[in-house]
UniProtKB/Swiss-Prot annotation:
The keyword Transferase applies. Catalyzes the formation of 4-diphosphocytidyl-2-C-methyl-D-erythritol from CTP and 2-C-methyl-D-erythritol 4-phosphate (MEP). SUPFAM superfamilies: Nucleotide-diphospho-sugar transferases (SSF53448). Pathway: Isoprenoid biosynthesis; isopentenyl diphosphate biosynthesis via DXP pathway; isopentenyl diphosphate from 1-deoxy-D-xylulose 5-phosphate: step 2/6. Pfam families: IspD (PF01128). Belongs to the IspD/TarI cytidylyltransferase family. IspD subfamily. Was identified as a high-confidence drug target. GO terms for biological process: isopentenyl diphosphate biosynthetic process, methylerythritol 4-phosphate pathway involved in terpenoid biosynthetic process. This is 2-C-methyl-D-erythritol 4-phosphate cytidylyltransferase.
Length: 231
């Protein structure tokens, strides 16, 4: 597939089971006020006006359902056994004579992410940063603890941030990070894509996140999302 220079492709890993949410279906397929989380996430990306193509990775037995839900809005691929493998599989569709300039990776569970946040990440990429993540300052005090629950220390909160998605990268950097990082450590040890970039020595730039880009993981998160959607 030939792609134009400067194109932005967004990958949405949505192959997880969402066991903590316990809604009886994979989390991405849960309907929030009549619309699935995956549909809301994809629409937010496209509504930003800065994303050209969306690739969604879903459980292998849900590909037909995903195509029916999303139609022409996204390419559908089967995901893997964990998040890192799923993104890796989605990256394979980017092979061709011309790769996109930038790749975003966005959690389907962050279904209410404002389009303006997506645009902010891409703007930073176009400004010359090779890896960009949206973040929010922490309001809670954080404790480091050992396996026995003993507090080891209290990190300085002023220097800590909660990371959101979409996370954006130059395509070459993300591909190199996955190729090398996945060989060095088990996939389960990487909780986000920026961690892979950090692992190979890449620099990651932060931009302002948005409270609406919270991850719907628990029943409490779901209640909050429902309240927001219903106004």
């Amino acid at each position: 597939m030939v792609r134009e220079a400067g194109e932005v492709v967004a990958i949405v890993p949505a192959a997880g089971s969402g066991e903590r949410l316990a809604v009886g279906v994979p989390k991405a397929f849960y309907q929030l006020d009549g619309q699935t989380l995956i549909e809301r996430a994809v629409d937010g990306l496209l509504d930003s006006g800065v994303v050209d193509t969306v690739v969604v990775a879903v459980p292998a037995d849900r590909t037909d359902e995903a195509r029916q839900i999303l139609g022409h809005r996204a390419m559908i691929v089967a995901g893997g056994s964990n998040r890192t493998d799923t993104v890796n599989l989605a990256l394979t569709v980017l092979s061709g004579t011309a790769e996109p300039e930038f790749v975003l990776v966005h959690d389907a569970a962050r279904a209410l992410t404002p389009p303006a946040l997506v645009a902010r990440v891409v703007e930073a990429l176009r400004d010359g940063y090779a890896a960009v993540v949206p973040v929010l300052p922490l309001s809670d005090t954080i404790k480091a603890v050992d396996a026995n629950g003993v507090v080891l220390g209290t990190p300085e909160r002023a220097g800590l941030r909660a990371v959101q998605t979409p996370q954006g990268f130059t395509t070459d950097l993300l591909l190199r990070s996955y190729q090398r990082g996945s060989l060095d450590l088990p996939a389960a040890e990487y909780t986000d894509d920026a961690s892979l970039v950090e692992h190979i020595g890449g620099q990651v730039q932060v931009v302002d996140g948005d409270p609406l880009a919270f991850k719907i993981t628990t029943k409490l998160d779901l209640l909050l999302a429902q309240a927001i959607v219903r106004g």
